[in-house]
């Protein structure tokens, strides 16, 4: 084997429950605090720290995300005097998102995702700067009020369509749906920051479950590692979501704005990357 081919092979490190639990803890804290599930953190940490290949890291991440997102979503919904999540909105987002992710995954072999990644990165920068500006000014509706606007059938149809588009983008590019759901609800529909994050956590569950099953059937899941990641991620997600309920809305919006800018830098294509089937769900 030549030196060049040797360098292209990813060799997994010796399994370490402590390392996987730490990875899960970091992802769970970020996912609970920001309402995005945690895949945005779990996947790169597995690749860099545990030396798992990209596909296996994504499949393992999706499996670990399920209990992490469930606990975080339950905290948003039950951990406050009023539920910080909207179930009808989550349902229509998930309905569109599941079909969109499947369509995106099917089309991913025939469509180049480079231009789409550039477009998504630009949108994330715009949304991140808007969140930061709103946090500094402090008068934006989603940071002042906590209520969900009164939605009618047309609004729910638009929300489902938004979920469909997000699902397609997720399936084509691998960007987690939660990263896009929160800005859609906050900036597109005027939903409060906290409620948008709690709703996002509920909405990504069906897509994460389908993605986890798909990767498991393909042999891209390390169940032992996923279990340890969930063990570290669940209590951290509980802490992160509790912090989200405690922080002022302006601070939470500012944090999410910074997160979107960081996500945009990761989204910008710098080289040919392997695409996951159903995204990483945040």
Question: How would you describe each model-predicted region?
Answer:
Residues 1-29, 48-49, 54-56, 74-168, ...:
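Juxtamembrane transmembrane-helix boundary motif
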Residues 26-30, 40-41, 45, 210:
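N-terminal signal-anchor/start-transfer transmembrane helix
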Residues 35-45, 172-184:
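Transmembrane helix boundary and interhelical junction motifs in multipass membrane proteins
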Residues 40-41, 63-64, 179-180, 202-203, ...:
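Hydrophobic alpha-helical transmembrane segments of integral membrane proteins
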Residues 43-44, 67, 182-183, 206, ...:
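Proline-centered helix-kink/hinge sites
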Residues 58-62, 193-201:
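Small-residue hotspots at the loop-to-helix junctions and early N-terminal turns
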Residues 63-72, 107, 202-209, 235-236:
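Membrane-embedded alpha-helical segments of transport systems
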Residues 211-215:
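Membrane-helix boundary/interface segments in integral membrane proteins
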């Amino acid at each position: 084997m030549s030196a060049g081919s040797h360098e292209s092979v990813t060799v997994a490190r010796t399994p370490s429950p402590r390392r996987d639990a730490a990875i899960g803890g970091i992802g769970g804290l970020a996912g609970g605090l920001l309402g995005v599930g945690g895949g945005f953190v779990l996947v790169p940490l597995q690749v860099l720290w545990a030396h798992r290949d990209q596909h296996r890291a994504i499949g393992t991440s999706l499996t670990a995300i399920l209990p992490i997102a469930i606990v975080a979503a339950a905290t948003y919904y039950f951990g406050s005097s009023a539920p910080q999540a909207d179930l009808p909105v989550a349902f229509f987002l998930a309905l569109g998102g599941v079909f969109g992710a499947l369509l995106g995954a099917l089309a991913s072999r025939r469509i180049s995702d480079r231009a789409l990644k550039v477009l998504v990165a630009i949108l994330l920068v715009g949304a991140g700067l808007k969140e930061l500006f709103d946090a500094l000014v402090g008068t934006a509706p989603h940071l002042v009020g906590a209520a969900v606007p009164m939605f009618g059938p047309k609004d729910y149809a638009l929300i489902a369509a938004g979920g469909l588009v997000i699902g397609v983008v997720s399936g084509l590019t691998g960007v987690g749906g939660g990263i896009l759901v929160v800005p859609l609800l906050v900036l597109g529909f005027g939903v409060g920051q906290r409620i948008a994050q709690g709703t996002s956590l509920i909405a990504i569950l069906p897509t994460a479950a389908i993605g986890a099953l798909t990767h498991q059937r393909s042999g891209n899941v390390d169940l032992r590692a996923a279990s340890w990641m969930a063990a570290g991620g669940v209590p951290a997600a509980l802490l992160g979501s509790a912090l989200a309920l405690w922080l002022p809305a302006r601070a939470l919006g500012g944090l999410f704005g910074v997160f979107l800018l960081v996500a945009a830098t990761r989204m910008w294509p710098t080289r040919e990357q392997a695409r996951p089937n159903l995204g990483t769900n945040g």
